[in-house]
């Protein structure tokens, strides 16, 4: 696992040489928080147009997941009602999307410890066949950005291009 400290400026960054499937993918990772009630950014990309994506824990300890913000409108955002305050446990998160799906709620799915999260205070889905910035040939970063540095542990981050998978695949 990797350990990140809020007081450090350490981060990971990867820019892909070419974009992959920008409509369908899955990201799975294990996370253990060590600092609560702080704004924390796990992933962020700033694109020249001002768009970005990320997974962010807010000061009220809910998660805010956004796939694409084009500078004026969200193209996929889920903000949990559930809080994540257990600093002694690892959480397994799976974020899976497929914008080719005809049903909006099938285009973006979020799982916590093997169970699909279905209660959100904000719930918007990408348009059908929307290209997203995840898996584009731009900087993909962990622990970077304006939302605040992450304090905790991150393990087994897996990105699957071209498939919308559920937690049983990991």
Regions found by a protein language model. Give the residues of each.
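Extracellular glycan-interaction patches encoded by glycine-rich segments
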Residues: 68, 131-154
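Surface-exposed loop/edge segments in extracytoplasmic proteins
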Residues: 50-53, 72-78, 115-121
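Extracellular glycan-recognition modules
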Residues: 7-66, 101-104, 163-168
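Short, aromatic/His-centered strand-loop micro-motif at the edge of beta-sheets
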Residues: 66-92
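Short tryptophan-centered beta-strand motifs in secreted/extracellular beta-sheet-rich domains
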Residues: 27-29, 88-99, 110
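Solvent-exposed, conformationally flexible loop/turn segments
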Residues: 86-88, 124-129
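Short surface loop/edge beta-strand patches of beta-sandwich-type extracellular domains
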Residues: 5-24, 75-85, 144-146
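Extended recognition patches within non-cytosolic domains
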Residues: 1, 7-8, 102-104, 109, ...
């Amino acid at each position: 696992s990797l350990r990140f400290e809020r007081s450090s400026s350490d981060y990971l960054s990867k820019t892909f040489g070419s974009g992959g499937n920008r409509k369908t993918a899955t990201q799975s990772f294990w996370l253990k928080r060590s600092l609560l009630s702080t704004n924390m950014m796990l992933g962020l990309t700033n694109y020249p147009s001002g768009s970005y994506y990320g997974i962010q824990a807010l000061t009220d300890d809910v998660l805010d997941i956004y796939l694409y913000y084009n500078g004026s409108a969200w193209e996929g955002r889920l903000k949990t009602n559930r809080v994540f305050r257990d600093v002694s446990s690892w959480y397994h998160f799976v974020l899976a999307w497929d914008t080719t799906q005809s049903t909006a709620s099938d285009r973006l799915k979020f799982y916590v410890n093997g169970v699909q999260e279905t209660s959100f205070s904000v719930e918007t889905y990408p348009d059908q066949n929307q290209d997203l910035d995840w898996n584009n040939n731009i900087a993909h970063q962990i622990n970077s950005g304006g939302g605040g540095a992450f304090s905790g542990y991150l393990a087994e981050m897996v990105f699957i291009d071209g498939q919308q998978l559920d937690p049983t695949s990991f």
